[in-house]
Design a protein with these regions (language model features):
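Acidic/His-rich, divalent-metal-binding segments that scaffold phosphate/diphosphate chemistry
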Residues: 1-28, 38-47
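Feature representing long, continuous alpha-helical segments
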Residues: 10-17, 30-34, 38, 50, ...
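Generic structural signal for hydrophobic core residues of well-folded globular domains
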Residues: 13-19, 23, 59-60, 96-102, ...
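Flexible loop/turn segments at secondary-structure boundaries
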Residues: 20-23, 30-32, 42, 61-65, ...
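A glycine- and charged-residue-rich anion-binding loop/surface
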Residues: 22-30, 47, 51, 56, ...
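Short secondary-structure boundary/capping segments
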Residues: 28-31, 69-74, 110-114
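Acidic/histidine-rich catalytic neighborhood
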Residues: 41-98
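Regulatory modules associated with amino-acid/nitrogen control
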Residues: 75, 79-172
Length: 172
């Protein structure tokens, strides 16, 4: 939150992300984009319309991806990362998603949800900041997997024979 450059974008998105919900409209996030544009223009926040519109339109996507898809699957990450024209928008969406979910009631926000959301955020952030595309994401994912496997082998080799640990890890 502290690193967000324009907090007014986040505040506007928090206030407007469900603006079309009371109308009982299916796909309230789509209708909400038009409604938020009108409101922001009236408030003289023309320069925030595109970013707030993006956040309103996508405010359900991060939680749906984090909780219903495999955040370790490169295809999931490619699809999710492709939505973001700029890495900064991921930062805003992450905070908006957290605020939206944690505001519902105490039972909705769990450690598991927190972990899944953070995992999706971190993996996607790396992709966006490194400007990875297509097979570069696959290569990066494979490289990270190898690094993790190597660190597990190193840690377990302190108490077990290294060859046995490597054989087990490589067989997974």
């Amino acid at each position: 939150f502290r690193n967000l450059r324009r907090k007014e974008i986040l505040y506007a998105a928090i206030l407007l992300h469900d603006i079309a919900k009371p109308r009982g409209v299916a796909d309230h996030e789509i209708t909400g984009v038009d409604m938020s544009r009108i409101i922001l223009n009236r408030l003289g926040m023309d320069d925030a319309v595109a970013d707030v519109g993006f956040l309103v339109r996508n405010h359900l996507v991060m939680e749906q991806t984090a909780f219903r898809r495999n955040v370790h699957d490169p295809d999931t990450l490619k699809e999710f990362a492709a939505r973001f024209p700029r890495p900064e928008l991921l930062d805003y969406l992450y905070v908006l998603t957290y605020a939206d979910l944690s505001a519902l009631n105490a039972g909705v926000w769990t450690e598991w949800k927190s972990a899944m959301l953070q995992e999706l955020f971190q993996r996607t952030s790396e992709i966006l900041l490194r400007n990875l595309r297509g097979t570069e994401i696959d290569d990066y994912h494979h490289e990270k997997h190898e690094e993790t496997a190597e660190s597990v082998v190193d840690a377990l080799s302190a108490s077990l024979p290294r060859a046995e640990v490597e054989r087990h890890i490589r067989g997974m």
